[in-house]
Amino acid sequence: AATAATAATAATAATAATAATAATAATAATA
């Protein structure tokens, strides 16, 4: 259970990082 929770947390963090990177790229492209 702990391993699954850790994996889910890591996946969520990776998704958030990807979204942040995409937002940054979009902002840079707009600017």
Curated annotation (Swiss-Prot):
Glycosylation sites: 3, 6, 9, 12, 15, 18, 21, 24, 27, 30
Compartment list: Secreted
PTM remark: O-linked glycans consist of Gal-GalNAc disaccharides. The three proteins may differ only in the number of repeating units of -Ala-Ala-Thr-.
Signal peptide: none
One GO cellular component term noted in the UniProt record for this chain: extracellular region
Protein name: Ice-structuring glycoprotein 3
Chain coiled-coil ranges: none
Biological function: Antifreeze proteins lower the blood freezing point. This fish lives in antarctic waters where it experiences water temperatures near -1.9 degrees Celsius. Its blood has a freezing point of about -2.0 degrees Celsius, and 30% of the freezing-point depression is due mainly to the 3 major high molecular weight glycoproteins in the plasma.
Further facts: The two small glycopeptides are present in a much higher concentration (5 times by weight) than the HMW glycoproteins but produce only a small depression effect. The exact physiological role of the small glycopeptides is not known.
Chief location: secreted
Key words of the record: Antifreeze protein, Glycoprotein, Repeat, Secreted
